[in-house]
């Protein structure tokens, strides 16, 4: 709903569509089956987005990628699942490399898809309990760590496109060995796997416990937001960030947040790299020498600041926002 509202406020939001909570309830009432006409509706929505962005889902030359996220009525931080980069396959990878001229970025995006998909769709949604408490994501991270050690790399940034390709291949072998399922190479299989996994996450253990604690009714269900991917990691002029429309600790009217150059959304919150301050006024002694978004991309920062004002006026409350900058173009992902 917030994404749709931002669109109505003429705030730049990547195009997408929502599968409603009614479908979630139908799914649980119908023995985990989706309504018969849903695939026609989804395909029509995909076509509309393809027309807006002039890209095609599953296309070998100019592929469109999607994220699948939950859209619960009440925010349930970290409880519900997300899968990014859906649509990367052996057929679309070469096209995206040709399009972006960035082999490293594409293979990095692909290994992220594999990690998230294995964790969210193949393991958690299927209700598989990890052996020795080590889930598939943990195992894949161990594979990556040992690969870096072998190569003498200290950070993810050190890996080349070929490195990420090798790591992805190792990931797929481990997934097959551990979970007895192939990582799907068809974009539609990936998409529907992601959609069903979000619905299933509504009844995951963590989500149920959280609802009990917060008094959120089970029958609300979750919606699924399917949204075109925009990338904060295609170039130096790309970035990703999170912000509060004012200081969350004091409520002071200061635009407050963090951003990472040439990074994808989850990097900011994952703690893998140290984010930079959003602007000059909120710098502290510890980050006073770091590059702020305000000084690096002043036009984009100005636009972001205008969005912040619009959102506060509209919602009459402090907002917590996520944004991505793709090749110098601002996109709002969440408020």
Which residue ranges define each predicted feature?
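Nucleotide/phosphate-binding sheet-loop regions of phosphoryl- and nucleotidyl-transfer enzymes
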Residues: 1-335
